[in-house]
Design a protein with these regions (language model features):
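Glycan-recognition surfaces
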Residues: 1-98
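Short, glycine-/Ser/Thr-/acidic-enriched flexible segments
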Residues: 64, 100, 123, 145-146, ...
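Catalytic cores of secreted or luminal carbohydrate-active enzymes
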Residues: 81-131
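Hydrophobic, well-ordered secondary-structure elements that form the walls
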Residues: 151, 180, 203
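Generic recognition of flexible, low-complexity loop/linker segments
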Residues: 73-75, 136-141, 195-196
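C-terminal beta-strand-rich structural cap/linker in extracellular carbohydrate-active enzymes
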Residues: 190-213
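Carbohydrate-binding surface patches
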Residues: 86-89, 94-96, 133-172
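Solvent-exposed beta-hairpin/edge-strand motifs
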Residues: 168-185
Length: 213
């Protein structure tokens, strides 16, 4: 259901378990980021039996079809970031492209079991933004069942940049030893104290699964 008049205030009582938040997404980086930012703000209403639907994904469209043509298409990095964001947002993972035409790099994105596990986590909490959410830096945190936290570092700008991950806004202390795993690259990064720094390419995202040692 897509509504313009406080749809989120009455849809639960109508028996709906998920609802479209906005109009149609486009196959473009600008559209993906805009929709994701707006969906982040709707986090407090999401949860078990009440899922925010930012729209089906444009991963793999490559500029084809109506949505692809009006958007123009995205790079593989942009599609990867798109899938990562939807997983962090606990959004329905609806593929909008023809999977028969998938390239291996698209399959690698949409079949990432570690990201899907974050999306389907039993706690059912949507990611929230850590301060600050400005200057092209968007850092999201998603609490997971069992005490882990998933973090997403999104660089929406046109240039690569170093981004800082700080976990003291998530109930952990900066002096805690935190083990990080890059679930985008399926790679353990080791233990960290006092936060961590990451080089994030333009129009890209890194998702990390963290637990306190």
């Amino acid at each position: 259901c897509l509504g313009r008049k406080t749809v989120t205030e009455w849809m639960k009582t109508a028996g709906a378990s998920m609802w479209r938040l906005f109009g149609d997404i486009k196959d473009s980086w600008e559209s993906i980021v805009t929709v994701a930012k707006n969906a982040i703000e709707m986090g407090p209403i999401a949860g078990h039996g009440a899922w925010n639907d930012p729209d089906m994904m444009v991963v793999g469209l490559k500029g084809e079809g109506y949505v692809g043509q009006i958007g123009g298409g995205c790079t593989v990095n942009e599609y990867s970031a798109h899938f990562s964001l939807w997983c962090m947002l606990s959004a329905p993972l609806l593929l909008g492209h023809d999977v028969r035409k998938d390239m291996p790099e698209i399959d690698e994105i949409v079949l990432n079991r570690e990201l899907i596990a974050i999306n389907q986590d039993d706690l059912g909490v949507q990611a929230y933004a850590l301060p600050p959410m400005s200057n092209g830096d968007i850092v999201l945190a998603k609490p997971l069942y069992g005490g882990d936290i998933a973090f997403c570092l999104l660089n929406e700008t046109d240039a690569a940049k170093q981004m800082i991950l700080s976990w003291d806004y998530c109930g952990w202390e900066m002096t805690d030893t935190i083990h990080l795993r890059d679930v985008t690259a399926h790679r353990d990064l080791g233990n960290f104290l006092h936060g961590a720094h990451f080089d994030v390419p333009a129009h890209s995202a890194i998702v990390l699964r963290a637990h306190r040692v």
